[in-house]
Amino acid sequence: MAILISPTNNTGWGLGTHKLFGGAKQKSDQHPVYVQAHYRASWGSKGRRRRQGRARGAPLDPKTEAEMVATIDEVARNGPPAARLVLEAARRVGAYNLRRARKLTPAGRAMMAMRARQMVKQAKKRKRRVRFRQ
């Protein structure tokens, strides 16, 4: 159950994730923020669920995207040291978040367990091959 705090007088919003109404579930012109997350009480439930039906931003046109990538690459190659440090830190943080996400989600944990089983199986096959060759 999500407990929401309304900024005014509790009109237009319900309590609970499946009982929200009045634009609280989706962004709109009348409700510019995702109300369920924005006005959640600090002592309310906090899930790690991903929001469904979230609108993506408009995709960049290929020319702009190519210019952006070229600029980042240029800074990474011969930009000022501070800018290079920022880019390197961003890469490390992104890699950390990727590794962490695998541990947090059930699907990620299952994927890691499957990968570990595959590696063990490969190691056993290699061991058998070496034993038969001798």
Curated annotation (Swiss-Prot):
> How is the protein modified post-translationally, according to the record?
Cleaved near the N-terminus by the viral protease during virion maturation to form the mature protein.
Return any one Pfam family short name.
Answer: Adeno_VII
Site features described as Cleavage, chain residue numbers: 23-24
Per the entry, induction is: Expressed in the late phase of the viral replicative cycle.
Q: Which residues form the propeptide?
A: 2-23
Q: Extract the InterPro entries matched here.
A: Adeno_VII (IPR004912)
Disulfide-bonded cysteines: none
Q: Summarize the protein's role.
A: Plays a role in the inhibition of host immune response within the nucleus. Interacts with cellular nucleosomes and immobilizes the host immune danger signal HMGB1 on chromatin. In turn, prevents HMGB1 release out of the cell and thus decreases inflammation. Also plays a role in the wrapping and condensation of the viral DNA. May also promote viral genome import into the nucleus.
Q: What else is known?
A: All late proteins expressed from the major late promoter are produced by alternative splicing and alternative polyadenylation of the same gene giving rise to non-overlapping ORFs. A leader sequence is present in the N-terminus of all these mRNAs and is recognized by the viral shutoff protein to provide expression although conventional translation via ribosome scanning from the cap has been shut off in the host cell.
So what family is this one in? Belongs to the adenoviridae histone-like nucleoprotein family.
Quote the protein name from its UniProt record.
Pre-histone-like nucleoprotein
Q: Which organism is it from?
A: Canine adenovirus serotype 2 (strain Toronto A 26-61)
The beginning of the lineage is: Viruses, Varidnaviria, Bamfordvirae, Preplasmiviricota, Tectiliviricetes
